[in-house]
Amino acid sequence: MAEEIRKILEQLLNSISGLYCILISDRDGVPIIMVQNDKAPELAMKPAFLSTFGLAIDRGSKLGLGKPKTLICSYSQYQVIQMNKLPLIVTFIASDCCNTGYILCLETQLEPILSNLTLVVTET
Amino acid sequence: MEKHIERVMDDIISSPNVFGCVFVDHQGLCLGVKGDASNESAGIIGAIADQAAKLEPQSQPPIIVMEDDTKSCIIHRNGTVTGAIYKTN
């Protein structure tokens, strides 16, 4: 199953120019599956960075607007888009000029993969 | 700003045969949507305009028309804003 998922993710990665990495991790930021190219920044793929999303959505939910679904962080050279699919976190790392809206569209395409992975994570 | 874009979209949607429109910024994020159109298509519309512009990089941004038997979608980029208009043939 892992190979199939990796293949699908690689296809998605190659379909968007400027997208460097797609990473699916658990709520602690531990990577479950990851596809990347050589431009992906190492630091943004570490659990220390990924797990801050969990804290951010906890804080964000206190704004009274419901649970955050997506977090977009725009940096000078990169943008990091994280989706709340708890118990999973989906992270996209892309260049700053990459089409953010197009990456957000991938959510529906990832849904079948995520439902499979969620089953695995909740069982373990 | 919203009022201005709302007015533009109202003008567009009141044109004959037009049933929807979407406006997208340079990052593919939805600026506004009116009628029978989805804000989820914003990113794809931006990407289509980007890819089509790469065919002739020296020229002005192209007008892209996609049509089927009954409907058509017209996409055009002007500066940082891309607009898509859906209309019946």
Feature locations, PLM:
Chain B
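Non-catalytic interaction/Regulatory regions outside core domains
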Residues: M1-N89
